[in-house]
Regions:
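Alpha/beta-hydrolase fold active-site loops
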Residues: 32-33, 112
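N-terminal "domain-start" segment that seeds a small globular fold
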Residues: 1-25, 142-143
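Conserved redox-active cysteine motifs that mediate thiol-disulfide chemistry
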Residues: 30, 37-54
């Protein structure tokens, strides 16, 4: 297993999107990319979503990409949460709950969990939320 830590390259992965297409991390990279581990049943994840949506709407055109990795097991609930919370970025899930291979690959023990990547795909920070997350993303994008 590759070590997943700050300063290291993020490990590539691919998984099905809600519409059944396979999406990979490599094709989702922007100037800054957030890998966001969450689930429809995770209260703290859903509470954080409005902050992430606002940040994405403000900074996507400046180079921010997000790929959501869900630990859901029910496809309908996953898709419903994406629509209800207006999560317009790329999403993937193998619908395997805590057996989600990408969560295991990234050694995710609890959610929400975030990994912030630079333009080269290196992990520069982990598990930031709210203002701290936005500040780090803006710093990486060179946005005031």
């Amino acid at each position: 297993m590759t070590e997943i830590s700050t300063g290291k390259p993020a490990s590539n992965f691919s998984a099905p999107s809600p519409d059944g297409k396979t999406i990979s991390l490599k094709e989702s990279l922007g100037k800054v990319t957030i890998i966001d581990f969450w689930a429809s049943w995770c209260g703290p994840c859903r509470s954080e979503n409005p902050n992430v949506v606002a940040m994405y709407n403000e900074l996507h055109d400046k180079g921010l990409n997000i790929i959501g990795v869900s630990l859901d097991k029910d496809a309908a609930k996953w898709k419903e949460a994406i629509a209800k919370d207006k999560l317009t970025w790329a999403h993937v899930s193998n619908l395997k709950f805590w057996d989600e291979p990408i969560a295991k690959q990234y050694n995710v023990q609890s959610i929400p969990a975030t990994f912030i990547l630079d333009a080269k795909g290196n992990i520069v920070a982990k598990d930031l939320r709210g203002d701290a997350l936005k500040a780090k993303v803006k710093e990486l994008l060179g946005v005031k």
